[in-house]
């Protein structure tokens, strides 16, 4: 039986990619998708969003409209939206994958507390194998070079990037700081 996936932010860059990947995987079923109520794709077929023929999945205007159709919610939206989705999901207890960045410490704490009490959660700023390998290499390098060096993280993004520094840059900074026995503010 396929895992029924709901994709939050299906018209965004990551949302579209996730929808395509779910549609291509025989072990997954795209059970539903949604966007912000103000998004022009709400009410239309997801195929229009993806540049594909009609696929029979309507883009809904809220998580409430699709949550009962799925087993897991995949959310790479915006920090305030992801927090609201976690709050809604606390009542429904669906598994959640959150790859959103830009959370404040309080927002992230609330999400983790909601999950601890109500639903399984995978949350990370960057889930790619390459970045997670880079994080490990940064930890090792920081331990080897130790105190004799300054560290600077420089990044570049497309102009549509909504958060800076990125979650990946923060993840790298946290790994280096931990290896050096510092905080990421040092």
Give the label of every model feature segment.
Residues 83-92, 99-124, 129-141:
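Rossmann-fold NAD(P)-binding glycine/threonine-rich loop
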Residues 24-51:
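NAD(P)-binding Rossmann-fold cofactor-contacting core
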Residues 73-74:
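N-terminal Rossmann-like NAD(P) cofactor-binding module of classical short-chain dehydrogenase/reductase
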